[in-house]
UniProtKB/Swiss-Prot annotation:
It is an enzyme of class 3 (hydrolase). It comes from Buchnera aphidicola subsp. Acyrthosiphon pisum (strain APS) (Acyrthosiphon pisum symbiotic bacterium). One of its GO terms (molecular function) is 3'(2'),5'-bisphosphate nucleotidase activity. Its EC number is 3.1.3.7. It comes from the Bacteria. It catalyses: adenosine 3',5'-bisphosphate + H2O = AMP + phosphate. This is 3'(2'),5'-bisphosphate nucleotidase CysQ. Converts adenosine-3',5'-bisphosphate (PAP) to AMP. It is a peripheral membrane protein. InterPro entries: CysQ, CysQ/Inositol_MonoPase, Inositol_monoP_metal-BS, Inositol_monophosphatase-like, Inositol_monophosphatase_CS. The keyword Nucleotide-binding does not apply.
Amino acid sequence: MQKINFFDTINNIWRKMLDKICQLARSAGHCIMKLYNSQKFINVSYKPDNTPITDVDYAANNIIKKGLSLISPQIPIISEEESYNFEICRNWNSYWLVDPLDGTKEFLKKNGEFTVNISLIEYGVPILGVIYAPFFDVLYSAFYDNAWKEEKFGSKKKINVAQAEAPLLVISRSHPNETLKNYLEKIKCCKIKKMGSSLKFCLIAEGTAQIYPRFGDTHIWDTAAGHAIVIAAGGKVQTWTGGNLNYSLSSRVSFINSGFYASAL
């Protein structure tokens, strides 16, 4: 009789789930690109924090929510495009985090630097992350300590962070501030690249960039998928005080993150 390895069985179950999440991210991305390439008028409104939201955000969100509800109906979902009673969410140990269109500003600028972000949180830790950049047709994924990159439905390859003699520092294209400006003035040895959305995390994870500093506020759906991918690729994501970004809702007062940095060092 063939012996069944319990851990291999569990691992295979999670790998199959990851594959489904990757397919779901692609489906949302294809919807985004259909609207990106169309001549249809895109309705834009603004949230209280003055960030834009469009019909495209909602369309992608509906695809992801429906898909996640079929894949794992027992796991609740937190999406950027929904409203939640935070006190109820505080009791969730496991939940999905979704940003259906990360980089709406980049989408509206037509520069291609926008992504679909999906991650799974278990007891405050992002254990699974998927980032799909539909304009470039590149997908990044991670589960625990393994991270991969797949281009244009090609072969999936493992990725790892990499150090460099002349580190590349990647920063937000649309969120400059005075603290970042002062920081960059002190970092003379680094090359600097501006990039939109969670692609900054991906550049760290694949070894192209080495440092991603963020001083302004973000939300947990902005960072969780990228966090999972960087950690799985051997990097780190920490607050400026040296702590870990924590996604445990019971220890938070809101969905907002303070500043952090991701790095290969």
